[in-house]
């Protein structure tokens, strides 16, 4: 016949297994390949947008690794808490244990977190390096944050005029069949399968130039030039926004971004 201690251990193990099964079943049902949409948020979506660049591919991979690690930690901690609450409750232990330490446990809870942090840190550092080091680029774009819009320049193309992307109001967005608070009156256009450098700054408030499908979020700071790069791996329309709470009309600073095919670079 099983002892109370064995029953408690079994119960805690069941809790851990159920938690893990529910977590990974949810992952299997919803998928970890990105929210399927035209480069914009999906109603009811909870996951990252579908990747449209090599950098976002790596962001998604790192996110997935961390998600699995966190899920395993949650299942383990929940099972451990249940085990402790039942096994070491006052009724089962009228005389408290006077154990002061356990060398093996202390080694485990020191070494295991270090291993977990290394598993997370190594790919994260590689990703940060990949994002920060601007590769050989064929197109350069300068984005200047204003109140409350983005102004774009093509420094390498003197024959291309600068323009300001203004947000569409609710009526204009509805008539154009575009998402309100995401669409603008003028798209930023760059070719697909091309390394593009983005130079970002601001004339007034701090902003953040963000395109989730490309894994880009870079601060626009007055008097400072920041830069990053991306490579659109497929054609389409991708929406972004300012991700820095910059003032009263922060919600109006939108990005509408399209990637034509190489033959349409014109």
What are these regions (language model features)?
Residues 14-29:
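Hydrophobic alpha-helical membrane-insertion segments
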Residues 74-87:
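Alpha-helical transmembrane segments
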Residues 3, 27-66, 85-259, 263-265:
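Non-transmembrane, membrane-proximal soluble domains of secreted or membrane proteins
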Residues 70:
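Active-site-proximal cofactor/substrate-binding loop regions of enzyme domains
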Residues 3-18, 106:
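Alpha-helical transmembrane segments and their helix-start/interface "positive-inside/aromatic belt" motifs
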